[in-house]
Amino acid sequence: MRIDPKRSRLKMVEEQIAARGVADKNVLDAMRRVPRHMFVQDALASRAYSDSALPIGEGQTISQPYIVAVMSELLQIESGHKVLEIGTGSGYQAAVLAEMGADVFSVERIRKLFISARKLLFDMRYFNIQLKLDDGTMGWPENAPYDRIIVTAGGPEIPQYLIDQLADPGILVIPVGGQRRVQRLMLVTKTDGKIETTDMGGCAFVDLVGKQGW
């Protein structure tokens, strides 16, 4: 069955995201614009706008639209913000952040995903996104500090390297907790050198792999 991507996208935003309390207009508008079906495997395109995470290969997933919206809203993105993303995946979250006006620096550790995301984002003319193939738990120090940092995989703790690369003031959003996709979504703020963390609730992500991950 063929889907109408635009209609499905608008329905996704209204029924799965806005209806569940996400109110940031910048987030909602960005997710209305980004064609999620372009970031999933062809065989799963009919499910691209469903309320679920989907496999993208290499044991990784594209996050559920609602959790993408929640994390994006927590970041409080303003135009021109430098945002570090750990875990490019297929590139969907990076595209949403770019549509919100951010300059995105995204790190991916899996070569195949890095190559495919780089090509897709370039073809879609997201020139405000830079990608790097590396251990994301180490951040991207050459371009630090970052106004915002988002981690799209769950680790055992908040990597100190990422805290060090966070601007002051700055916001970091990261899933933290046990392996096997059971974590707590943590909101980390840095203000006048002081670090505060707030538990925003349960979540389920693939494992954060790297020197400061699993």
From Swiss-Prot:
Broad enzyme group: transferase
InterPro entries noted in UniProt: PCMT, SAM-dependent_MTases_sf
Active-site residues annotated for this sequence: 63
Record-level GO cellular component terms: cytoplasm
Keywords: Cytoplasm, Methyltransferase, S-adenosyl-L-methionine, Transferase
Family note: Belongs to the methyltransferase superfamily. L-isoaspartyl/D-aspartyl protein methyltransferase family.
The protein's name in its UniProt record: Protein-L-isoaspartate O-methyltransferase
Species of provenance: Maridesulfovibrio salexigens (strain ATCC 14822 / DSM 2638 / NCIMB 8403 / VKM B-1763) (Desulfovibrio salexigens)
